Design a protein with these regions (language model features):
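Ser/Thr-glycine-rich phosphate-binding loops at phosphate-binding pockets of nucleotides
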Residues: 120, 124-125
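Cys-dependent protein tyrosine phosphatase-like superfamily
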Residues: 1-115, 127-187
Length: 187
């Protein structure tokens, strides 16, 4: 599957059946055409899951667009960069807290559709997506399939990250179904 937007790597509708939620990587190069798409589909709430340092370094243009309600709601532990599979499992555990549940409730109770994102739209966005889908009663296979789409969408980008950070094992940065299966057990 390719990205819903040309300006991003990993944008797609959440498979919730109601076209209220779009998950994505940071849309920092979003085009006017893509903004029009969001408005046309009543996706008028933006939830930025990134940590403050990421938010400041790579701002999202939707923050200053008065047609959107922009919420900065960082996911706990989002600034952790695990090196191993085990560290990634722990990082996902760290994300599952009351703050994450508050973020999910904010998204699910929005008066409009919501686009939400972290840097790559993979880990923090993946956890938020899994919790939303679980709360909506979506089956585990669909939740895992949605999560794993990020692997295909981001593979070129992930290989580049691996080259830039040779100490990081590729398994730690590539989406793995175990990460989300573990989260689903906690819901």
């Amino acid at each position: 599957m390719s990205s819903l937007f040309k300006s991003t790597w990993n944008t797609r509708w959440l498979p919730s059946g109601d076209y209220r939620y779009i998950r994505t990587d940071c849309p920092r190069n979003i085009t006017e055409e893509e903004i029009g798409f969001l408005i046309e589909h009543n996706i008028l709430t933006v939830v930025d899951l990134r940590e403050e340092v990421e938010y400041v370094k790579r701002p999202c243009p939707l923050e200053n667009d008065n047609r959107f309600k922009y919420l900065h709601m960082p996911v706990s532990g989002g600034d952790v960069y695990p090196v191993t599979y085990e560290e990634t499992m722990k990082a996902y555990d760290t994300m599952m807290d009351d703050n994450l549940l508050n973020i999910v409730d904010t998204i699910m109770n929005s008066a409009t559709g919501v686009i939400y994102f972290c840097a790559a739209g993979k880990d923090r966005t993946g956890v938020v997506s899994a919790v939303i889908l679980k709360k909506l009663g979506v089956d585990e296979k669909t939740i895992l399939d949605d999560y794993m789409i990020s692997k295909d969408n981001l593979m070129v980008r992930l290989e580049k990250i691996k080259q830039e950070h040779p100490n990081q094992t590729i398994r730690a940065i590539i989406p793995h179904p175990d990460y989300v299966k573990n989260i689903l057990k906690k819901i």
